[in-house]
Amino acid sequence: MLDSIHSARWLVQFGEQDIDFLLFPSSPHRRVHPELERLLSGSGAATFRLVPLARYFALPLWVLDKFANNFFRGSLLRQVIRKFKPSIVHALELQNAGYVSLRALSNQKPKSLKLMVTNWGSDIFWFQRFPKHKAKLQQLLQLADAYSAECERDVVLARNLGFTGQAMPVIPNAGGFSEADFAIPLLDPSERKTIALKGYHGWVGKAKVSLEAVREMAEELQGYKIIVYSANRSVLKLAKQISKQTGLEIETFGKGTMSHKQVLEMFAKSKIYVGLSESDGISTSMLEAMAMGAIPVQTSTACCDEWFGDSGVAVHEITVPAVKNAIREALKLAEDPANAEKNLETIKSRASAEMVKKIALTFYD
């Protein structure tokens, strides 16, 4: 997925390794993420190249493959493999890159070629419940030699679907937190008067439930500033309506309008963070909140139990009453600085850039 910051952050870890990367687009976007563009034009030990004409065929072939079960991109990927003879094909994400790899290699996988697939977010946890996707996932996982995921949960799910190969160490797919990230000044918990809400609503995101909980808690939350970030249009509209009705100070940021650093700086002054989703792998926002001292309120579908216990709040049902209770509990947890300190130590020990990179560098051995 050439437009993905997650792809770019994964690849940047290998910039000083003697590896030749040939990038094949799996998403319909002609845009290449700026971070990835820098790799393509860089001069480190690793080389990063796009498959010839990749910027031009990504969209039209994706459209055709919607009706042809990935025939066109699968055929093209097969030709690319025959021409360039890679030692590893690594599918970063399953429903696009993985399924295209399946079409290219099913019944025609060279014995010398290693197929590695990486589960992103909801790739298995959500899609396994749909029969057509489950069948494809089973075929792909039985073909794969190696599998990586962000959650131990998803390793178990892959095994249940027939994967018998090498399970790589569980790490965040997008890399870890740098020294510069950890150097961002953190506001003292007692001085924090901001609540951060992830603003995505649609497919699996449920930001509107968060906002409805805020509406019903308006009296309790007077004095707090609510920041709704990464919000789609309908969420921006609802936030404005609730602010007008309740008098709460609600600041909004549309999807893609905040940089990574700005998001971290927001969490560095937030008392709690609320993120609701029907399905996810690791929630990157949850990790960012934990790194910056904001107590997380996260749906249990995001493997949050693998990252915090009593220093955060897991939401087990996405209803307004449940979210209201979770917000109240998180605000109480935020009163004890030890909870934020515990979360920060978890991030430093499991998600620092140095540690994640050290593990990632073993993937292509």
Question: In which residue ranges do the predicted regions lie?
Answer:
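N-terminal subdomain of nucleotide-sugar transferases
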Residues: 1-39, 215-218
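Donor nucleotide-sugar binding/catalytic pocket of nucleotide-sugar-dependent glycosyltransferases
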Residues: 117-120, 142-183, 188-190
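Conserved donor-binding/catalytic core segment of Leloir-type glycosyltransferases
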Residues: 148, 186-218, 227-230
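Nucleotide-activated donor-binding/catalytic signature segment of Leloir-type glycosyltransferases, i.e.
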Residues: 237-257
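Aromatic "clamp/platform" in nucleotide-sugar-dependent glycosyltransferases that forms part
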Residues: 278
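Short hydrophobic beta-strand element within catalytic cores of glycosyltransferases
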Residues: 294-298
